[in-house]
């Protein structure tokens, strides 16, 4: 197990984050000599069930001990964490124990299917969720990135206790996990405790299959009518994915910079569309990366989604052709660097950043050097390569007509 301790002796609070390199996209993998196909939503379902122990519930144990525990599942990671000002080592022991010792019964799985099924029905009624999910399904034909992390009511009905044990065996092994601790702690004590509780064997590396994704998008447009007061849109671009290593960090920084320069609230595009009433303050964008995929998207409320999407495309082409104004580039660069730096004030942010770096084979603390190496020409080239009309999709949610 890889352990990372960031000592902060001046703080009362300590934070522990125990994560596995396993998330919603990891549906097909090779275990015990054969390929396994698992239903959509298993990683998220497993995260919910991990808190069950033979003696009760680890969430309650941690809370009773003064800790604030929680967990999340993303497309490529599942993380369990807590922060506390007292009984830190005791709480860490509880965390490491319940995550490494699975306990599932068919009864508890059936009960959870009802609970998560209700959650899924609720999120399916959420316009933001539909807008984003339909955008992903328009972007991707084969990649499991197009699948909702929670799965569907139908897909989770196929999950059994055996499915959960198999996935735990495959991915909850020390070699596929990392423990990150930030705060007023003794690194030696943390390592000793982990050594005492966790299994000695690392476990083999598990091959995964995310699907062979073609360069073309799956669908250019998707539109759905729902109970919303104003029409909403997301336009997205299917970008070239990055390999693990420093290239992954560089692509992440480059994509974020491109996003800020093209779409940020001080950008010429934002100012113009806002003044013309095409967008409002709900408008925003982001660049995301997952195993084998990367995409840049933007949107918000708009009465003219097609015009907004066309203007974003036009501005990307203009910046790619004419280049980026030097003063504007430096201003955005400083703001972007500053917000990355401020992120280091948050214990949770540090832990998640270190974890992502470890899973993707780069050192996140090298971001100042990577930042310095990126030029405005690099950003223009990124826009030229990735933000083309063929790579674009449009997802819309419109008010239902009574």
Predicted region positions:
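Flexible, glycine/charged-enriched surface loops at secondary-structure junctions
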Residues: 205-211, 284, 322-332
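A structural supersecondary motif
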Residues: 234-241, 261-302
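Histidine-acidic residue clusters that define the catalytic metal-binding segment
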Residues: 138-177, 211, 340, 356-385
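Extended amphipathic alpha-helical segments enriched in small hydrophobics
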Residues: 296-298, 302-325
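Acidic/histidine-enriched segments that form metal/cofactor-coordinating
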Residues: 54-167, 280, 311-314, 326-352, ...
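His/Glu-rich zincin catalytic helix
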Residues: 1-58, 165-272, 309, 392-402
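C-terminal regions of mature proteins
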Residues: 178-181, 319, 330-402
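Second-shell loop/turn segments in exported
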Residues: 32, 49, 79-83, 103, ...
